[in-house]
Amino acid sequence: MVVVNKTNLLLLLLSLCLTLDLSSAQLRRNFYAGSCPNVEQIVRNAVQKKVQQTFTTIPATLRLYFHDCFVNGCDASVMIASTNNNKAEKDHEENLSLAGDGFDTVIKAKEALDAVPNCRNKVSCADILTMATRDVVNLAGGPQYDVELGRLDGLSSTAASVGGKLPHPTDDVNKLTSLFAKNGLSLNDMIALSGAHTLGFAHCTKVFNRIYTFNKTTKVDPTVNKDYVTELKASCPRNIDPRVAINMDPTTPRQFDNVYYKNLQQGKGLFTSDQVLFTDRRSKPTVDLWANNGQLFNQAFINSMIKLGRVGVKTGSNGNIRRDCGAFN
């Protein structure tokens, strides 16, 4: 049996903290100032063009970023395509609903960068996804903010690594807090990043349990607004095609704003994992605060996105810059 005294434990914790600090220490604004000075404008132009083609680009890119960062860090491992020898992250059951427009946004931005000689293969796919996510938030009416750059692309992507790392629609605050804490994110970060549900859509089958089969006592979740239940049942009848999706935010689905929190106050959170933010006493005060002050929410969202972008950063021999975002070099 190994005995760990307090001194050894303290040293272990300090070592862990130092490792985490070093992994994100290389991140900085204007990281590519010397190698590709116009990187952010090039990516922005590509993203803007993609958004003009389809609005789905916005929520798809935002969701792709979360799914990437929550599984072994922000390293573009979610971009990797499966091969005969490896089933990659993107083909895990929980990632199959990631819209293709998110992947295409990164691919198009990469192509735009590679068309500039001094930028070709100089910018990581992980950084491209980070910039693109910032840009889609802003293009949807959300805040503009500076992003830290300098990530390398991951060298591994397996479907087996995904399980248990992503939030589920039925999660309560305890489960959500635990998942976010594993990535160094606080309760406030969790509430702020959940605000991304002000954009996007979800498949009807994800809400069936709340409006048809809640529990043995009642078929409908009592925390759902009655008018919203009627609306959901009309949009999502029992026999609907499982590919059909509905807006996450029933009020302003194409606008990045704080209406998500106002919806929660009215019992109009689409998922259980949304509505519990209002019904749980630990998160309710923050929901109320941001529902009443959009600027405070925007600032909190920026801070939490920057923290999210530091999760699992790859450095040195743990990563590289991919020539193709969908395949290892």
Curated annotation (Swiss-Prot):
Its main location: secreted. Residues 1-25 form the signal peptide. Glycans are attached at N215. PROSITE patterns: PEROXIDASE_1 (PS00435), PEROXIDASE_4 (PS50873). Ca(2+) 1 binds at D68, V71, G73, D75, S77. The active site is at H67. SUPFAM superfamilies: Heme-dependent peroxidases. The keyword Acetylation does not apply. It is found in: Secreted. Pfam families: peroxidase. Its EC number is 1.11.1.7. Belongs to the peroxidase family. Classical plant (class III) peroxidase subfamily. Removal of H(2)O(2), oxidation of toxic reductants, biosynthesis and degradation of lignin, suberization, auxin catabolism, response to environmental stresses such as wounding, pathogen attack and oxidative stress. These functions might be dependent on each isozyme/isoform in each plant tissue. CDD domains: secretory_peroxidase. Induction: Enhanced expression in response of mechanical wounding. Induced either by incompatible fungal pathogen attack, or by methyl jasmonate, a plant defense-related signaling molecule. Expressed under a diurnal rhythm (circadian clock control). This is Peroxidase 50. GO terms for biological process: hydrogen peroxide catabolic process; response to oxidative stress; rhythmic process. One of its GO terms (cellular component) is cytoplasm. Its cofactor is heme b; Ca(2+). It comes from the Eukaryota. Ca(2+) 2 binds at T198, D249, T252, D257. Substrate binds at P167. It catalyses: 2 a phenolic donor + H2O2 = 2 a phenolic radical donor + 2 H2O. The keyword Calcium applies. One of its GO terms (molecular function) is heme binding. Keywords: Biological rhythms, Calcium, Disulfide bond, Glycoprotein, Heme, Hydrogen peroxide, Iron, Metal-binding, Oxidoreductase, Peroxidase, Secreted, Signal.
